[in-house]
Amino acid sequence: YRLKYNKIINQVSERPFESDKGNDFVLKIFENSISKEKHYALVKNIKSLNESYPVRMHKLNIEKDIFAEKNIFGDEINHSFDVIEKHGSGAIVLINNDIAPNILKAFDQRQKKNNKLELREYGVGAQILKNIGIKKIILLSNSNKKIIALDGFDIEITEQQKI
């Protein structure tokens, strides 16, 4: 209820972002006003509320994303950059689970941790999407799970694309 009706995610900064995987992105940094966690969105060419954009909702995983540890999930971030570059627009929303201060503990518990987004995190991601002006998404995901939590935020999944 609070995630739907109370705005708890606020943009705190933004800057241009370019990498080997894509140019002309803007890195937007958001803060959860309750937990103080920082979340990130890499955004490219979002101009119309009526257009569907490719979006990757990604829960940050220190072992996989930073240290490139081998796992069964593949390279979703790099593939998402490729899809967005080909489309010419889109966003990668990076949901932080405040894991950075506890890197060693995260390594020890990686078998127990679920790397899927939880319902609470979809609410955070939905608030970020609304802030950057996205109402219709082409969800970039290898999961077949139907995400219904976004409906309450007036965000529509128009298509799902495997990455």
Predicted regions and their residues:
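Catalytic domains of riboflavin
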Residues: Y1-I163
